[in-house]
From Swiss-Prot:
Residues holding Fe(3+) 1: D79, Y111, Y211, H272
Record PTM text: N-glycosylated. Glycosylation is important for draculin anticoagulant activity. Probably also O-glycosylated.
EC code: 3.4.21.-
Keyword Translocase annotated: no
Annotated positions binding hydrogencarbonate 2: T478, R482, A484, G485
Source lineage: Eukaryota, Metazoa, Chordata, Craniata, Vertebrata
Species for this entry: Desmodus rotundus
Signal peptide: 1-19
Name listed for the protein in its UniProt record: Lactotransferrin
């Protein structure tokens, strides 16, 4: 009994510390100096009554990544190259806070990977074969992935399964690549200065490890070129006269002074980031800890402990010494979004054979929203003999994210979503030009873009309903964020009321993409089984133009916000679906902004606004190729193509408006409207920006962070 009592006392004594560790953040360190700094941070946080911190020791970044994934640690800061590795299976970590560089007046969450040489050398970037090289570490961004990716054409590397490290070892006469396997590839560790087991070590035990170590390798004369970041030489040589003894190698085989890194660099790289688990990652706790740490011990503080400083002889412990602070990364950002398409392309190029790289560049990956679009896309892919392949996502924003990450190339979007895509850095490729009477296919491709009219349509029998009396009625919308169904009518409503409480203006609505538990989803019906209610894809039967009009036709709503062409395409036998078969155009009318009503045929004088055409978007580096492929594809499968309707039609759908609008005559050239601002027009861009005061999208928030 006495032993049991003592055991209980022991557990009670341990309990608070165990609970504190669960609540607190466990930071992973990779060396004794890092562990010592972590311990000091822990003590100083305790002194200022900050968040709880404990320190976990491992031997390498990989072991720390594994510990975080296994819930034996919670966080650490990683170079972008390691952020990529940590974001892959089986770890699936994500960046939660970015280190901020630059100055207080001009902060930035990126840096530039550069190739640094001594001024008295005669080297150019295309003359590095056979020289001695200094690297920050294996698989790190500025020191390995970027330079090796840049030099790939000269390496004589056929791609996997041939080892990349072997190709690099044979390319340079000697190197120091900390973390490399010196037994298997001795040339990669030949220049390293560590002794015994510390030679080529993956930590500061190797004097030439990290940015400052790679620079020291060059400065000491061990190497001829150092692959580092733009600030490395400034941090190690405060004296300008000393810095002037070094120059940068530029991709165009010229050289520039070290302060011209924005014009002479190998790549722009996202800054180091603190990573955590994607699920159950303690993101809020980590951010509270970082916020308190930078407030109490960051730049400009006077205490003896400095968060962004390392003891003499050490560099970049826990965080970069040159960091100014942290910025929280929006929750929508995963490792691939954080790194961006250019950096991801470099990484993919290092994982694929030359043939695979070429094949990937020749393919067009279309992003289909939902299962119905995917089925049509797969039909297209089969008929295109693999020129077009398909991927899918649940909604348009997820598709945009796939395009940003290089996992997809293109999709066609409503103008409101083109706004988000443009803010994220994508560009228009071709526009959906509406079907018109007469005119050849060539005329259509080169025809000036007109767009469509956004209208408010009601049943003729609801005689008392006007634009001025729509408060309290039931409304049908194409989807939240879409042009005719949301941005235009709700933008007008916001201008009228200056209120964002849209769910209080109408009694009930169906606005796919809204909160499923709100009034804005009350009229939505989901699929035939009642699932996916209010989903922003074709699983919701009241989604998009035809769905919004169907919501009105089936008496769910009193007013539907659609395009004029939507109303014209469905009545009088034009609509093929069961709900549209007995409709008559004369049974519907339009609400005019002046409070009157007019027949649908008079939409030119009774509409809410002109809506920009749907358009195909892609990454800027793919626009020219996408235009070429899509014009070729519509030459075969377009409205006048020889294989439509026999084989496949781009602009026909089993249901409605899959991949493209069914009333598209052709994909037309942009007539100079090559940016999202020019494509949408200044008035529409301003209207959407104003409406964004009421709500933002997680993707738009993420892109705003990533592009600053």
């Amino acid at each position: 009994m006495k032993l049991l009592f003592l055991a209980l006392l022991s557990l009670l004594a341990l309990g608070p510390s165990l609970a504190a560790r669960r609540r607190g953040v466990r930071w992973c360190t990779i060396s004794k100096p890092e562990a010592a700094k972590c311990s000091k941070l822990q003590q100083n946080l305790k002194r200022v009554r900050g968040p709880s911190l404990s320190c976990i020791s491992r031997k390498s970044y990989l072991e720390c990544i594994q510990a975080i994934a296994a819930k034996r640690a919670d966080a650490m800061s990683l170079d972008a190259g390691l952020v990529y590795e940590a974001g892959q299976d089986p770890y699936r970590l994500r960046p939660v806070a970015a280190e901020v560089y630059g100055t207080e007046g001009a902060p930035r969450t990126h840096y530039y990977a550069v190739a640094l040489v001594k001024k008295d050398s005669n080297l150019q970037l295309n003359q590095l074969q056979g020289v001695r090289s200094c690297h920050t570490g294996l698989n790190r961004s500025a020191g390995w992935k970027i330079p090796v990716g840049t030099l790939r054409p000269y390496l004589g590397w056929a791609g996997p399964p041939a080892p990349l490290q072997e190709a690099v070892a044979n390319f340079f006469s000697a190197s120091c690549v900390p973390c490399a396997d010196g037994n298997q590839y001795p040339n990669l560790c030949r220049l390293c200065a560590g002794t015994g087991a510390d030679k080529c070590a993956c930590s500061s035990k190797e004097p030439y490890f990290g940015y400052s170590g790679a620079f020291k390798c060059l400065k000491d004369g061990a190497g001829d070129v150092a692959f580092v970041k733009d600030s490395t030489v400034f941090e190690n040589l405060p004296n300008k006269a000393e810095r002037d003894q070094y120059e940068l190698l530029c991709p165009d085989n010229t050289r520039k002074p070290v302060d011209e890194f924005e014009q002479c660099h190998l790549a722009r790289v996202p800054s180091h980031a603190v990573v955590a688990r994607s699920v159950g990652g303690k993101e809020d706790s980590i951010w509270r800890l970082l916020s308190k740490a930078q407030e109490k011990f960051g730049k400009g503080t006077s205490g003896s402990f400095q968060l962004f400083s390392s003891p003499p002889g050490q560099k970049d412990l826990l965080f970069k010494d040159g960091a100014q602070g942290f910025l929280r990364i929006p929750s929508r950002v995963d490792a691939e979004l954080y790194l961006g398409p250019s950096y991801l392309t470099v990484i993919k190029n290092l994982k694929e054979s030359a043939a695979e790289v070429e094949a990937r560049g020749a393919r067009v990956v279309w992003c289909a929203v939902g299962p119905e679009e995917l089925r049509k896309c797969q039909q297209w892919s089969g008929q295109s003999n693999g020129t077009v392949t398909c991927t899918t996502a649940a909604d348009t924003e997820d598709c945009i994210a796939l395009v940003l990450k290089g996992e997809a190339d293109a999709m066609s979007l409503d103008g409101g979503v083109i706004y988000i895509a443009g803010k994220c850095g994508l560009a228009p490729v071709l526009a959906e030009s509406q079907r018109s009477e007469g005119g050849s296919n060539l005329d259509c491709v080169n025809r000036p873009l007109e767009g469509d009219r956004a209208v408010a349509v009601v049943r003729k029998s609801s005689a008392g309903l006007t634009w001025n009396s729509r408060r309290g009625t039931k409304s049908c919308h194409t989807a939240v964020g879409r042009t005719a169904g949301w941005n235009i009518p709700m933008g007008l409503l916001f201008n009228q009321t200056r209120s964002c409480n849209f769910d209080e203006f109408f009694s009930q609505s169906c606005a796919p993409g809204a909160d499923p538990n709100s009034n804005l989803c009350a009229l939505c019906v989901g699929n035939e089984q009642g699932q996916d209610k209010c989903a922003p894809n074709s699983n919701e039967r009241y989604f998009s133009y035809a769905g919004s009009f169907r919501c009105l036709v089936e008496n769910a709503g009193d007013v539907a916000f659609v395009k004029a062409s939507t109303v014209l395409e469905n009545p009088d036998g034009r609509g093929t679906e069961a709900w549209a078969k007995d409709l008559k155009l004369e049974d519907f009318e339009l609400l005019c902004l002046d409070g009157t009503r007019k027949p649908v045929s008079e939409f030119e004088t009774c509409h809410l606004a002109r809506a920009p055409s749907h358009g195909v978007v892609s990454r800027k580096d793919r626009v020219q190729y996408l235009e070429q492929v899509l014009l070729d594809q519509q030459g075969k499968f377009g409205r006048n193509g020889p294989l439509c309707p026999g084989k496949f039609c781009l602009f026909q759908s089993e249901t409605k408006n899959l991949l493209f609008n069914d009333n598209t005559e052709c994909l037309a050239k942009l007539q100079g409207k090559t940016t999202y601002e020019k494509y949408l027009g200044p008035e529409y861009v301003t209207a959407v920006a104003n409406l964004r005061q009421c709500s933002t999208s997680p993707l738009l928030e993420a892109c705003t962070f990533l592009r600053n």
